[in-house]
């Protein structure tokens, strides 16, 4: 994919400082020179249906409701203006940042997913914490629902303050993992990120009790060799895809390690070793053991990640 092709990113915000961290992350990973169209998206808080029904019967309530809706829209415009100014201050061009607000239609998470699908967005970038008192869509429950309902658009979960540009691309030998590679090749050329293609070989302890394996050390040795042999072509292919997509050869490296009993822990440990601030994962991995799948490895990484972004590719 040509790195000059403009990418569309949907960023839901709610006015909290935590939500605005997604904008700081945009500036960090992409920068103002990257061809990006940013859509700042705000969902208006909804009123109880009973109030709306009463407004149809009582003029006084109807007038107050109209006044409240105007203030609601004004607040939305202020929040979106603040977000846009934050990006403009980072060097983004005026025409590259669009602001949109709307009433909730189906539900917060579904509205976000529907909007991204209609706009054919290339990414949803969302902070996982927002206004806790109001429990808006940046709280964990709704952010997880965005992952659940989303069918096609990669979701970037910004967890805390991210300060590192490098990317860890964790893969196995599944088609889903290779989709994450293709997406990295689509979205990362033009950035300054160094990409480490990473795989931790499954330890046999993930399959059976440790006590049984101690008597058969040759199995562990054979397994490590075979596991590395199986994944090596995929690691090589992943690097070729990224370089062909436009990343420089010195921007991409491969790391294959002997894994522990937890692939998620291996990934998080390697994030520190490679000085990465972003993890790319396929939503599901090998169907037989579900490596890097939601509900197992990806879920563990999302839960334990701090001050980093996790990009889940469906």
Put a short name on every predicted segment.
Residues 2-8, 18, 31-33, 111-163, ...:
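Gly/Ser-rich helix-loop-strand patches that form or flank binding pockets
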Residues 26, 83, 112, 146, ...:
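Aromatic/hydrophobic pocket-lining residues that form π-stacking "cages" and hydrophobic walls in ligand
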Residues 9, 80, 112, 181, ...:
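Fold-core signature of tandem repeat domains
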Residues 1-66, 165-224, 228, 240-253:
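Small/aliphatic-rich secondary-structure junction motif
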Residues 16, 45, 104, 131-132, ...:
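Residue-level marker for beta-strand->alpha-helix junctions and adjacent short loops that shape enzyme
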Residues 69-77, 228-232:
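Glycine- and acidic-residue-enriched helix-capping/strand-helix junction motifs
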Residues 1-4, 48, 70, 78-124, ...:
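Structural beta-alpha unit
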